Amino acid sequence: MVPKKLPLDLEEEILFRVPPRSLHCFRSVCKEWNALSRDKRLINKNFACAPPEFILKTRSNIYSISVNLNDDNPTINVRDLCFGDHLRGQHSLYGTCDGNFFLYDHFHEGGGCMVVDPKRVTRLLRERVLSVYKGDRFSVLEQSKKTRKIEIWVTKNKIGNGDDGDDVVWIKFMTISRPDFPMVLISHPSTNYFVENNIYGKAFVLSCPTKKPKAAWIKIDGVVFAKSDQSSVFVPSLITIP
């Protein structure tokens, strides 16, 4: 006897009641459940029923705090995430994604980004700064701490509001190799850059903090020079203003 398939709306009703931490386990049941568990509408509906939970960071620890208000006696559960030696010195917590913690390390020379996964495995990342390219695409700048070499990548196609990032293709736009180039620190809010490619060639402008007064580094068609006493920079946005 062939088993009867549940109606899609009933399957959705079952999945959205599953605790968020356990929802990913149901992705391997079948293709339909895998697609359904990734649906943004179901995810938002599922999270709306989840107990409040937030991250608390102190100088030396990071805690996960959950609040259960559904019982007669509300409870607060505090869980030490036990990073141990990963949090030596000063760190900034940028956020979490799929159980991974994104931190910025101020302790080591030059700073740096790191990702700590649920198994407490740490991976250091190269410096990266995100910007807009041609008004409808993204560009990303990454820099090596050892050589200070800069590589700039841009998305090949336009970025739409409905894109989820799975089909985005990145191509290398420009490489800058100068040992005297300043380190780009993404923790500083005034670090910005702009790239363009037109009839005059490829252009690159970087504004970043230095020990001296802030300067704009400019590269146009292979020529690099520094312009001092720069105080602001304009970077186009993907957001359309009506």
From Swiss-Prot:
Q: Which CDD domains match?
A: F-box_AtFBW1-like
Instruction: Give all residue intervals belonging to the F-box domain.
Output: 1-46
Matching PROSITE patterns, A to Z? FBOX
Tell me which Pfam families the record gives.
Answer: F-box, FBA_1
Q: What is this protein called?
A: Putative F-box protein At5g37040
The organism named in the record is: Arabidopsis thaliana
